[in-house]
Design a protein with these regions (language model features):
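Long, charge-rich low-complexity segments
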Residues: 86-93
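N-terminal leader/targeting segments and the first structural element of proteins
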Residues: 1-3
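Histidine-centered nuclease catalytic patch
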Residues: 5-37
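Polybasic, low-complexity binding patches
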Residues: 32-37, 45-85
């Protein structure tokens, strides 16, 4: 899929807004090359909850991230928000 064909966020699957960031499911530091489109708030949430090593161990699988309780909670909360919704990202304690 080309960057021009992107219509939904890789993490939350909501339609994308005017701002799109490109996330490496397997971090570049771990030799990941693929990128996927995400909302900025979704991108910050991923990196707030997972280290690069944890992301690399997941092998870029969305399913392994959404099983995480905090990510599942975030996805339920963000589901009804508009595509360009912005909110501060809370880091786990």
């Amino acid at each position: 899929m080309s960057h021009d064909e992107v219509r939904s966020c890789w993490l939350c699957e909501r339609p994308l807004g005017s701002k799109v960031q490109w996330h490496h499911p397997v971090p570049k530091a771990k030799r990941g090359r693929e990128t996927v489109p995400v909302h900025p708030v979704c991108h910050r949430t991923i990196h707030a909850h997972f280290t690069n090593a944890e992301l690399a161990r997941s092998s870029g699988a969305r399913e392994s991230l959404v099983k995480h309780s905090e990510i599942a909670r975030f996805l339920a909360w963000i589901a009804g928000k508009p595509p360009d919704f912005h909110a501060p990202t809370r880091r786990p304690r």
